[in-house]
Amino acid sequence: MATLAAFAQRRAITFPLLSDAGSEVIRRYGLINTTVPAANPTFGIPFPGTLVVDREGRVTARYFETPYQTRHTVSSILVDIGRPTRAPATRVSSPQLDLTTYSTDAAVSAGSAFSLVLDLEPGPLMHVYAPGVSGYRPVSLTIDPQLFIQLDPPRFPPSETYEFKPLKERVQVYSKPFRIRQDVRVEASGPAQAALKSMDHLTITDTLTYQACDDKVYFNPTTVPVSWTVQLKALDRERAGGR
């Protein structure tokens, strides 16, 4: 209990922390991290995770990882469950659509799992072709690869069916505001931490490609370069009680 109290005081944590001597509770719930060998000093820790609960204490969302170094950021979880964000955004407008981009987090560290967000709003009578469409250029997001960054496939929302009667064709499109999310993990391996230690920021670049049409005109495919810069912060390696 003294260890938890010292940790809470150092990190200004005001909510209750529960002690789990012998990892009894996490074993009961199947959360003990089975990737950690018994001889390892960290044996007995849980899989890193966050449970989101409602006012009645019911679990409404779960976010877990296998490596104990990886953590979903609070901001990325809030965006995932539909909460508003105050993240600074970049806005770009074209005759076909408006684009707003932001990172869920302004600063990350080794092991951070966060998200890059693109909000697209097609103009009046305009639609953008959805992934999987053939014959047109579907919307796509291509991240430029770089060391120590892991990327999940971009997440696109469900599309809608658009019927173009003159050609008797039905295709999947986005005609209403929609969001693309790119989940990013900063590696926490030894080589990654050594390389990131000398860096104070991280810039991620990508290319957004789409083709927009209205009820009369098929516009040429458009390519938009997009970038995000996040600050890199050092890991907190101080143990509870300053030991």
Task: Please annotate each region the language model reported.
Residues 1-25:
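Structural microenvironment flanking redox-active thiols in thiol-disulfide oxidoreductases
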Residues 78-243:
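Extracellular/lumen-exposed scaffold segments
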